[in-house]
Amino acid sequence: MKISAFHIILGISFLSVSLFVYRKKMGCTYSVYGIGRKKKLSIPEVVVFAPCMRIPAQCDLQRALKGLIPRDVIDKLSCLRNRIALVADDTGGSAITELRQALEEYLSILIGLTKKEHGLENLVEFKWKNLVDGRQETSVANAWFELLSVVHMMAMLTLCEADTIMIPKDYSGSGFRVVSTDCKRDAVDLLLKAAGYLEFCVRNVLCCIPPEIKKSMSKDLQDGVLEAISIQALGQGTEIQLGLAIESQKATLSVKRRLACELLIYYSQAYQCISGCDLSPGYGKKHMWFIKWKFLEAKAAAYYYHGLVLDKGSEPTCHISAVCCFLAAQELLVESKKACISFCLATPVTRAPPLWGAMKHLHQKIPEVASRKSQMYGYLLEQEKALQSLPELPDFQLSLRPDDYELPAIDPAWDSGNWEKQGKQPLKDHLNDSEDEIETE
């Protein structure tokens, strides 16, 4: 069994990280959840990359909204928000179904705070923290910021679910990883759903947040970052489709080339979106390395399949252009392996999955075809050196689109006629009550 230099480097890198983790364990440095439970130190494997999940942190909704809206509405807001925070913190975000349901219910009641007629948009200071280290990132008094954070969390949960599907816990008898066709299609559906959440954030929520508030928000919520993740999700969906096409005997060479070229377009767009963002804190640099890695893989795939199409021609120029494509694909594949290592070692450290799908096929085929075709047409390359230029890749309309997302209907509690019956307290009196409470404290 041949072991490439790429795998040796990866092994050394991961061994170094493992030793580092072991030393940390032998000392006193241990990460703990807020409830005091020890957090397992492990290096996660990543197929579908999602920036670190942000979850709600404790904030006093009761005090901020007391007397302004009915008590049952305040209680429902507080109860749902606390439930989301506790479940996410306790499970590390793995209770996806429960969290998704709670987030949908919370959105339904939260929407009322964004309505201008209620005058409550800037009264509550909403706090969010990083799930991994528990560090509080942002504290913003704006209901639209809270809505953005909730929908963003739904998108991250959906990406995590897709990642889980693509990392099976069992292996086939042959020792190779097997992901069923149904699981791959489910993962594509989830990626389109996540892209829809993020597109909604960019188009319908960010525009409602004042510029001065945007400056104080987490860098993960920049419009360029959100757009990049949305487009990246479409790219990963296309990569899965390319893998399915490679496995299918009915898929033509033209179909495979089209999918490979679309894959490249998605990652080109994602790179353009994120390149103009401030990536200094958090997961920014790791996110950039992920996009670079997948961009280089996509470009290698596009040139490989374009070369196969050109090689079908009968003219010498067709074969020369094809060989140029194959050699370019081989070089890009080498660069993609380097980018993969940089992605894995960027903080927080992760593991690359074993080669799967389209890229497993291409890592085997590209070096083989490049070597064979360059030997076969070496005499043409020597005779026609002036024609040794890389041909342009064809442009295609993109096939995948984000799923449409709409907010749930506003909770009926906001439309009830009980507000007057419960004696809605004037804002002025409410503020006076708050001052009295502060003095008492």
Regions found by a protein language model. Give the residues of each.
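Short coil/linker segments at helix-helix boundaries
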Residues: 133, 140, 160-193, 197-220, ...
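Extended ligand-binding groove/face enriched in aromatic
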Residues: 120-157, 200-208
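Acidic, Ser/Thr-rich intrinsically disordered and amphipathic helical segments
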Residues: 79, 98, 105, 154, ...
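Long, amphipathic alpha-helical regulatory blocks in the mid-to-C-terminal portion
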Residues: 198-200, 204-205, 258-278, 329, ...
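Intrinsically disordered, low-complexity basic segments at termini and long loops, enriched
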Residues: 1-24
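Eukaryotic intrinsically disordered, low-complexity segments enriched for acidic and Ser/Thr/Pro residues
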Residues: 22-140, 170, 220, 248-255, ...
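Positions within ordered alpha-helical repeat solenoids
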Residues: 112, 160, 200-203, 240, ...
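Amphipathic alpha-helical repeat scaffolds of TPR domains
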Residues: 148-167, 225-243, 298-305
